[in-house]
């Protein structure tokens, strides 16, 4: 089972919160104290809470569940994309479009358009168009890929969303809440933990911290998927008897 230790978190700087004047009082239970005007997060809480979240994600993946990684802040977007791809899951790393979950029907039509344009770009259709028309379609393709590329193969709503930066991604969290989709989120000292099923109190700005979260979630999803494949193989009679 994927777990993260206190040492891992200390080395990654997970305990450094925001300046005390920007704090959200709802995060008080998770704050150890302050140092040089910066809140220090109590990792005695974060370690078990994050490990509980990892166990939940692993369990979702073991049942063929879909995990959607969400992180559109500049510091998070690269790690979000790479980690999601590494475990064959899904991501939003550029901008959360309002209605991405709650208006899935419309999003699905945009994904269909994206896939149509992808086909046209490789089957020679673009070559038969005027330069201007080809350029317009190329730009449309690039725009759709940027917004929807990470969810184009999701095939339906996710079973859990994993969020870096609860404050920044409040629209995604609200949409998931409206649909009853569980939310795992990293919540810094300046953010509200409301609407989050699995709160991970921690630094949501430092790249080392972000990498620790995303890579751990990817490892948990992979481990869960591995359990699923092992069960499937057993059912198919591929596992030899002792």
UniProtKB/Swiss-Prot annotation:
Entry annotated with the keyword Ribosomal protein: yes
PANTHER family noted in UniProt: 30S RIBOSOMAL PROTEIN S2 PROKARYOTIC AND ORGANELLAR, SMALL RIBOSOMAL SUBUNIT PROTEIN US2M
GO BP annotation list: translation
Record keywords: Ribonucleoprotein, Ribosomal protein
SUPFAM superfamilies reported in the protein's UniProt record: Ribosomal protein S2 (SSF52313)
Listed GO MF terms: structural constituent of ribosome
InterPro entries: Ribosomal_uS2 (IPR001865), Ribosomal_uS2_bac/mit/plastid (IPR005706), Ribosomal_uS2_CS (IPR018130), Ribosomal_uS2_flav_dom_sf (IPR023591)
GO cellular component: cytosolic small ribosomal subunit
Name by which UniProt lists this protein: Small ribosomal subunit protein uS2
Organism whose genome encodes this protein: Shewanella woodyi (strain ATCC 51908 / MS32)
Transmembrane residue ranges: none
HAMAP family per the UniProt record, alphabetical: Ribosomal_uS2_B
Key word Ribosomal protein present: yes
Similarity remark: Belongs to the universal ribosomal protein uS2 family.
């Amino acid at each position: 089972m994927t777990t993260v230790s206190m040492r891992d978190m200390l080395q990654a700087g997970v305990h450094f919160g925001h300046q005390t004047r920007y704090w959200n009082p709802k995060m008080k239970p998770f704050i150890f104290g302050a140092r040089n005007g910066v809140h220090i997060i109590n990792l005695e809480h974060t370690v078990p809470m994050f490990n509980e979240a990892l166990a939940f994600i692993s369990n979702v993946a073991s049942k063929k569940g879909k995990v959607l990684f969400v992180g559109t802040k500049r510091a998070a977007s690269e790690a979000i994309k790479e980690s999601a791809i590494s475990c064959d899951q899904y991501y939003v790393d550029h901008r959360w479009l309002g209605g991405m979950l709650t208006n899935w029907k419309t999003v699905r039509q945009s994904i269909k358009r994206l896939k149509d344009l992808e086909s046209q770009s490789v089957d020679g259709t673009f070559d038969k168009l005027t330069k201007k028309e080809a350029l317009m379609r190329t730009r449309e393709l690039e725009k759709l890929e940027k917004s929807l590329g990470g969810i184009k193969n999701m095939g339906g709503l996710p079973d859990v969303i994993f969020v870096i930066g609860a404050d920044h991604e409040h629209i995604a969290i609200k949409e998931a809440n409206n649909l009853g989709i569980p939310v795992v989120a990293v919540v810094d000292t300046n953010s509200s933990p409301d609407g989050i099923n699995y709160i991970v109190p921690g630094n949501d700005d430092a790249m080392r911290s972000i990498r620790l979260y995303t890579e751990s979630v990817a490892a948990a999803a992979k481990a869960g998927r591995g359990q699923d494949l092992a069960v499937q193989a057993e059912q198919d009679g591929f596992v030899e008897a002792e």
